[in-house]
Amino acid sequence: MPNTALITGASSGIGWELAKYHASKGGDLIITARREDKLNNLKAEIEKNYDVKVKIIPLDLAVQGGAAALYKKVKATGKTIEILINNAGFGGHGIHIERELEQEEKMIELNVKTVVSLTHMIGSDMVKSGKGKMLHVSSTAGFSPGPLQAVYFATKAFVTSFSQAIDQELRTKGVTSTALCPGGVATEFFERANLQDTRLGQGKGAFASAESCAKFGYDAMTQGKLVAVNKRSFSFMVNWITPLLPRRLVLKMIATMQSIP
């Protein structure tokens, strides 16, 4: 039976569905995000449907020191975290130098630094107990550079690389690390990143559901997989096709997908 999981970015999308799926397995939860009302709604739904306990911690992890503040609050609960799911993250459409620098830096704070900090702090606790599982929600975006989302693609490349290295370092100590790299998923991400009018965003109707992606990633984590891409077609593309294409062609293709017609 699963034990307590800490899930960041749990107020919507993949994080929301991951929390429900973990609860369906009988595990308690600590969930965090900025939107307290959404967290309370999720807590109520889960505790109504499952015999588990849910602790909410409303917090903005995109500010400096957010991860340390979260860790302190988690420790104060007295709960031992057996599963860490680093899901919180956001993107942003536009030419890098035309976007607000503050937003780009916040993206790095949340998508990269928070992942590193929580992995370090909670991973250390897991090693001491001799067991633990981590799921880092990355993206197929991490397999290529991403013009018009330069920072977002780079942060996901970091997460995918980092997760694999952590798995190699900690697996013999009883701790595994899985990078979930989905393609397009029907969540709030596209609206928040102002991608809804792009060629990519216009294909949202064909995207995977957050529920199916969450279940796929969670199951991959429990199986100790290293990298999990939620569709075979995406996996084949990023692993076997894209690396063979000329670099500038790939850049032009991605720029076209992320442009507004």
Regions found by a protein language model. Give the residues of each.
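Conserved NAD(P)H cofactor-binding loop of Rossmann-fold oxidoreductase domains
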Residues: 87-92
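Active-site helix of classical SDR
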Residues: 119, 155
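Residue(s) in the substrate-gating loop at a strand-loop-helix junction
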Residues: 139
